[in-house]
Swiss-Prot record:
One of its GO terms (molecular function) is erythrose-4-phosphate dehydrogenase activity. It is found in: Cytoplasm. Homotetramer. It comes from Escherichia coli (strain UTI89 / UPEC). Gene3D superfamilies: Dihydrodipicolinate Reductase, domain 2, NAD(P)-binding Rossmann-like Domain. Catalyzes the NAD-dependent conversion of D-erythrose 4-phosphate to 4-phosphoerythronate. Keywords: Cytoplasm, NAD, Oxidoreductase, Pyridoxine biosynthesis. GO terms for biological process: pyridoxal phosphate biosynthetic process; pyridoxine biosynthetic process. This is D-erythrose-4-phosphate dehydrogenase. Belongs to the glyceraldehyde-3-phosphate dehydrogenase family. Epd subfamily.
Amino acid sequence: MTVRVAINGFGRIGRNVVRALYESGRRAEITVVAINELADAAGMAHLLKYDTSHGRFAWEVRQERDQLFVGDDAIRVLHERSLQSLPWRELGVDVVLDCTGVYGSREHGEAHIAAGAKKVLFSHPGSNDLDTTVVYGVNQDQLRAEHRIVSNASCTTNCIIPVIKLLDDAYGIESGTVTTIHSAMHDQQVIDAYHPDLRRTRAASQSIIPVDTKLAAGITRFFPQFNDRFEAIAVRVPTINVTAIDLSVTVKKPVKANEVNLLLQKAAQGAFHGIVDYTELPLVSVDFNHDPHSAIVDGTQTRVSGAHLIKTLVWCDNEWGFANRMLDTTLAMATVAFR
């Protein structure tokens, strides 16, 4: 069957989900029937077609009245502020992809359900009372038909959780720290301007800016045994896409750097193929732009100190990789629900 999807919020992730759907050739599996976005339809069409990070969209895009066309596919455009007023029942929506970055509570999910959607997938970490949180490649097999309101976690969680799992399974992690080196985001300023976070009052293109992160909480959500044993910090850097994560863990078993790399390389070629990639090429962040993997391990940066402290660098395209995981999780939800 083809999963009928509606997208709520047509920003960076919402637009990349549509592009990833068409570029990955999954239109027989997923069809987008509607997009709800407060911006005007002409602007939606323009930004879908022309993207500073990902270049021109190869498909023809046009807008006619209340419809957006990608090739010959018509997508209804809505501008509803109230979730309860969305016509999901009328449109026969199977899964709503809520890509607003604003909504994430069970109450918001239930509003989509009340409007007629069968399932809801948030494109960001949700509240603890959601049915489950998925990091595709790690725990999607735990999805059940009764899971209606689901979170796809965050781009950084999707990046680091598979690597942590691999290291923990092999060597037994005792504790760890994570530093996220993240490209600038829409909640920063082009030039100095007011913001509740005084660091984010400063021009994004001119500084490396420390910001708060809940990544440590995201890690312990998947690995409760690491509660109070993982910490995370984050900085934003003056690039517009791609993120690097510096992961340091202490492990129980003694290990060498080449053994760590061999473990991660084998995983990329085997059980985590398509989710984790591995490289030893002398690459920089722009080289990972438009990479569909959740995580790309940079084997040239792996270090081991004292046989028990592992440091490694993991890259991800925080937009494109995550958009592809949204599609993967959507299909996984539909498979268990509608089989």
